[in-house]
Amino acid sequence: MIEIAPLREADRAGWEPLARGYKAFYETELPDARYEETWRLLIAGERIHGLAARLDGQIVGIAHYLFHAQTWSADVCYLQDLFTAPEARGRGVATALIEHVAEAARARGAVKFYWMTKEGNRTARALYDRIARFKGFVRYDHPL
């Protein structure tokens, strides 16, 4: 059975390899200090929130999410990071994490729950197409 719970201090050793795996998947390298800062923010649970998915007591998936204001409605929930260990894929871990975030969003009174992925991430998109609706938006990033 998949167990989902908020990240806690004792989860650091299980969280970090998955966080690094997630960043590697998106071809992003970060300094160790960034992982430390992110971990502190996740554990504080004020600005960003983190979940761990466990199978047989081992952390095999993580989700990071946050709530933010929206111009025309109440707050919304954004799932920023979702990653499942390769050996645990296809076992419902990502779905369980998404559903747990959806429940947190409902409990908080959010009116929308959304996330993004790379256009070519076919494996993830196959899941997302089953459990959510693609809204057709295209994202642009402006350099700062």
Residue ranges and their predicted role:
Residues 8-11, 85, 121:
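Acidic/polar helix N-cap motif
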Residues 88, 92-100:
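Conserved acetyl-CoA pyrophosphate-binding loop and the N-cap/start of the following alpha-helix
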Residues 106-117:
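Conserved GNAT acetyl-CoA-binding A-motif
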Residues 75-86:
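Conserved acetyl-CoA binding element of GNAT-fold acetyltransferases
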Residues 95, 119-138:
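Conserved active-site alpha-helix within GNAT-family acetyltransferase domains
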Residues 6-74, 98, 104, 135, ...:
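Acetyl-CoA-dependent GNAT
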Residues 2-3:
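Extreme N-terminal starter segment of soluble prokaryotic enzymes
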